[in-house]
Amino acid sequence: MTVFMSDIRMAAQGGPGFGNDVFDRLLSERIIFLGSQVDDEIANKLCAQILLLSAEDPTRDISLYINSPGGSVTAGMAIYDTMKYSPCDIATYGMGLAASMGQFLLSGGTKGKRFALPHARIMMHQPSAGVGGTAADIAIQAEQFAATKREMAQLIAEHTGQTFEQISKDSDRDRWFTAQEAKDYGLVDHVITLAEGPISN
């Protein structure tokens, strides 16, 4: 079976090709937009878009704009791993709110190409998860949750230049940052004004 780029583009957007749809137009400029809670459906769309743009031109940057309260850890990690798998540099832009998994993806962009708009707010905290079932099931889930917490703290430490211990301490409760504070902390590299901000590659 032959799969064409237009088919992937259609699947990524959940509808037919470019037309007048604003998100299709953005995709044609190599701009991806995460503007909702992170779940499996959103993750599948974003992963497909990253893979599509990587296949179309592996030498050009992809811009990921983030205005998200966070969401599923596993869905977010699927996006993160696809970002790292792509041969393209992924420039990330925090706008509005980049919280929880939104913060994680923002700081996971290509070093030197992580931006925050001036009035963006960034929030970092430890991952959360509900547990249930038998006592044995709860113990297994708690062990997995602790491992995920350590893994994410280590990755954030690598992306920010902070120590693992500092990230673990700061993310124990909700930690809020202004755009400038996020830059000072290492979550982003630049704070840009609306006039300065690059819109496309």
UniProtKB/Swiss-Prot annotation:
Keywords: Cytoplasm, Hydrolase, Protease, Serine protease. It is an enzyme of class 3 (hydrolase). SUPFAM superfamilies: ClpP/crotonase. It is found in: Cytoplasm. One of its GO terms (cellular component) is cytoplasm. PROSITE patterns: CLP_PROTEASE_HIS (PS00382). Fourteen ClpP subunits assemble into 2 heptameric rings which stack back to back to give a disk-like structure with a central cavity, resembling the structure of eukaryotic proteasomes. Belongs to the peptidase S14 family. Cleaves peptides in various proteins in a process that requires ATP hydrolysis. Has a chymotrypsin-like activity. Plays a major role in the degradation of misfolded proteins. This is ATP-dependent Clp protease proteolytic subunit 2. It comes from Corynebacterium glutamicum (strain ATCC 13032 / DSM 20300 / JCM 1318 / BCRC 11384 / CCUG 27702 / LMG 3730 / NBRC 12168 / NCIMB 10025 / NRRL B-2784 / 534).
